[in-house]
């Protein structure tokens, strides 16, 4: 969740984050920058937060200037579930839902999940009637198609189905690794006779 999601006021999910620009770049931005530059990160999701008075989903400064221009991100920017609707409904940006969608698109968001609300039919009508610049939509469409091409979805759009697809997500080795991770991450918070340790041991 890009950016400063864990620095929201009161630790509240999706709340306001008053984070100075230097802290955004040098602390909260560094893990993203490393993933982009060292691993060629191809997908990113803006957080629900409002950072310094601006919803991240509709922030040109964060999604284009910082993320793409400064950090070099070239992949697909996908909304968090319902984030475009939240931008309008909760964060009060845009006169209408489609206005909020257009602001998110212009900011650098390419795709809305889980279904189109801000990127819906009225949003598309703005492009059909010339009320919105088609180049912003073309840029987003190109990024979506590029991601699909990289995944081979044009050659094999439904390469795995049914049991074959289920098999990919239920490998025995994956289950074993998950079980081992769970075992190694357990932390005993209070010993009520679970472990054979005397009460005098600290």
Language-model features: where?
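Glycoside hydrolase catalytic-domain context in secreted enzymes
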Residues: 1-202
């Amino acid at each position: 969740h890009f950016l400063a999601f864990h620095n929201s006021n009161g630790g509240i999910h999706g709340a306001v984050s008053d984070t100075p620009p230097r802290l955004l770049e040098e602390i909260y931005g560094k893990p993203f920058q490393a993933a982009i530059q060292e691993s060629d990160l191809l997908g990113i999701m803006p957080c629900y937060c409002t950072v310094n008075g601006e919803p991240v989903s509709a922030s040109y400064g964060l999604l284009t200037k910082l993320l793409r221009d400064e950090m070099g991100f070239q992949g697909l920017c996908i909304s968090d579930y319902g984030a475009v609707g939240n931008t309008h409904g909760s964060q009060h940006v845009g006169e209408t839902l489609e206005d909020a969608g257009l602001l998110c698109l212009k900011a650098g968001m390419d795709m809305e999940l889980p279904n189109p609300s801000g990127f819906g039919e009225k949003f598309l009508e703005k492009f059909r009637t010339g009320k919105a610049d088609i180049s912003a939509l073309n840029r987003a469409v190109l990024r979506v198609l590029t991601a699909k091409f990289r995944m081979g979805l044009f050659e094999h759009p439904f390469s795995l189905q049914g049991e074959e697809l289920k098999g990919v997500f239920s490998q025995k080795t994956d289950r074993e690794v998950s079980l081992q991770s769970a075992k190694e991450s357990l932390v005993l918070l209070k010993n009520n006779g679970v472990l054979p340790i005397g009460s005098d041991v600290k």
